[in-house]
Design a protein with these regions (language model features):
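S-adenosylmethionine/decaboxylated-SAM
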Residues: 1-118
Length: 118
């Protein structure tokens, strides 16, 4: 769809494991390069993705994280399943992260919009 939109020169598609792809992007540099990133991958590694993406996003850039409500399971304090605990933990971390501002949207399974502060 981005070819039809005429923005194919601005998008680079990379297919592969998220963690190693992010590590490759960091190695290739430069930091603060990307305008936007969308995180929707292995939930237990969300915190690792967040920290790596935060390095890659320019000040003023946007990070979008999907599934932040995890079908409501993040609200069940008795649920200690790894993916649920990871998302719950990241939600709390982002809320108190002075590097960013955020807005959590109740769309479908929850989406967090994160703005990287200058």
């Amino acid at each position: 769809h981005w070819i039809k939109a005429g923005i194919d020169k601005k998008i680079e598609l990379r297919l592969g494991p998220a963690m190693s792809t992010l590590d490759d992007l960091i190695k290739e540099g430069p930091e603060d390069y990307f305008d936007m990133a969308f995180i929707d991958a292995n939930k237990k590694d969300y915190d690792h993705y967040y920290e790596r993406v935060l390095t890659l996003i320019r000040p003023g850039g946007l990070i979008v994280i999907d599934n932040v409500f995890w079908s409501g399971r993040v609200l069940d304090k008795k649920n200690h399943e790894k993916s649920t605990s990871s998302i719950r933990s990241l939600n709390k971390k982002i809320l108190h992260d002075q590097r960013v501002s955020l807005s959590m949207l109740p769309l479908n399974d929850g989406v967090t919009l994160i703005w990287k502060r200058p």
